[in-house]
Amino acid sequence: TEMDGFGTNTNVIVVAATNRADVLDKALMRAGRFDRQIYVDLPDVRERKEIFEVHLRPLKKVADELDTDFMAKQTPGFSGADIANVCNEAALIAARKGKQAVGKQDFLDAVDRIVGGLEKKNKIITPEEKQAIAFHEAGHATISWMLEHAAPLVKVTIVPRGQSLGAAWYLPEERLIVRPEQMLDEMCAALGGRAAEKVIFNKISTGALSDLEKVTKQARAMVTVYGLNDKVGNLTYHDSSGQSEYNFTKPYSEKTSELIDKEISNLIEEQYQRAIKILEENKDKLSK
């Protein structure tokens, strides 16, 4: 084929990129075709620092207080494009405020805006709703503070941003290996908002939707992907080839499906009750 090359000295190199290498035709990956594969992960803290330095160069006036090491640590999971957006947004924020130089707070505000969306300070919220949101976010903050493996909290706000009425920002550790106790602590912290509503008001609300989505995905991953459940065992139903997307049947029986659903539910309920217990024992800290 043309990709193989008709001659030996054509000096033509074919380069391609994809986010879904798992669904490509295997014939494309044969020797003589795309026989060099380079996996590009999201930048780590050192690489983010270097990317910040590149994107800060065009900004003519940057305050001396700005520390690229600090900014790299504040942006885990950010891509190069995200960091470019942070720098551009920080410059715009500084310009709107009439500043002579882009400062550290401008960058932190830019990170908040990119992660959480635009502030909606004019959104009408009743005092009762505001109180419920405040205790919900305080629940997240209290649980993350009390648990050893939960990601440290960076910021809590009840100012509406994007589609959320409040938010808690964390600074997750960039781990290559995650232990079960670390995942359980993260689930417990995520359920801290709903647990706080239950402890303070003895009622729950719809405000925990994103938290429930997060813990359900984590619990399902523990049970069906990473083999971290004793009842289901050391099995994984994760198909890294991507072929499972085209199958209409599950790779396990109905009995196993029921067991998986039960274990996922048990995991989430255990962490919810754990969060309630922690908050009841530290109600004074929650109320502060």
What are the residue ranges of the model-derived segments?
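Short, glycine/charged-enriched secondary-structure capping and boundary segments
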Residues: L28-R33, E53, E148, L171
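Short pre-active-site segment immediately N-terminal to the catalytic Zn-binding motif
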Residues: N122-A132
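Soluble catalytic regions of large protease machineries
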Residues: A132-A134, A141-K288
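Conserved C-terminal "switch" segment of AAA+ ATPases
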Residues: G7-I13, K26-A27, V40-L108, R113, ...
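Conserved RecA-like P-loop NTPase ATPase core
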Residues: T18, F34, R48, S79, ...
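N-terminal alpha-helical segment
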Residues: R30-R33, D64-T68, V86, Q271, ...
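Asparagine-centered polar/low-complexity signal
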Residues: T1, N19, N85-N88, N282
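Conserved catalytic/switch belt of AAA+ P-loop NTPases
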Residues: T1-R36
